[in-house]
Amino acid sequence: MKRAPPGRTDFAMPLRRIMVIALAAVLTFGIAATVARAWQLPFRQYPGVEYSDYPLPRDYQDKSEWVFARLMYPALPGPGFRGNPNWKDGNANWTIDYPASDRHLSTEIRRLTRIHARSVEQPIDLDDDDVFNYPWLYAVEVGYWNLTDVQIAKFREYLLRGGFFMCDDFHGTQEWAHFTAVMSKVFPNRAIVNIPDDDQIFHVIFDLNDRFQVPGLQYVYSRQRWEKDGYDPHWRGIYDDHGRLMAAICHDMDLGDSWEHADNIEYPVEFTQLGMRIAVNYVTYAMTH
């Protein structure tokens, strides 16, 4: 069964605060966004492991300031879609939740902020330069990613030039170990640290002092919030030399499912509410820092 997306009262906040942040986004990012729109590659869509023919909105070709940029990546060798060697053609690990979660979140960014957001996502291949046209980049299930040396170098350059990376939906000690092995190649001399509760990213739009573990759809059947041995959620990140958060690492949670299943009446609404609030803050932070 489906439910309507979260209503406006679910995310109520002072209008003045929205307008101040929106003005900051325009002043900080407006000129750069105009240049980026001119160079963005055309929209492209791939078959996903959960959705193969997702309907397109009418305005899917419109240029915009912000686009949900989803990282395409090769994964560790393995059976099925996880180890698909033809990952550039879709039906691979990077397409988990895609494109439903991307478009549901894009709708909320449009509704809750003054950021001009496109209604559809853009898959990003680090083997070309399109990544530099997008200030915010998301990756799912990074406990399985397996970036090449060339992709690692491009990824590092993107972050140091002002890009923001958010990753999500990986669980337990084994997936964490593999994720950090890759990130240590991206930044050999930068530590992954816990994001302090007073960091701007937790307060730029919504005050997120009362965060909790957001589970995936499996909660509907299992009634447990964790997966594998990931019993507690972790909010970690990597900062640049000026104190800007470059990478927000959401470990032992599944925010992507909270966006994807925003219209699923069986999925608890409180998970979608928090998942959306976190994403709105992260996107706004990326656009204003």
Residue locations for each model-derived region?
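Bacterial N-terminal signal peptides
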Residues: 21-30
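Bacterial N-terminal signal peptides that target proteins for export
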Residues: 2-22
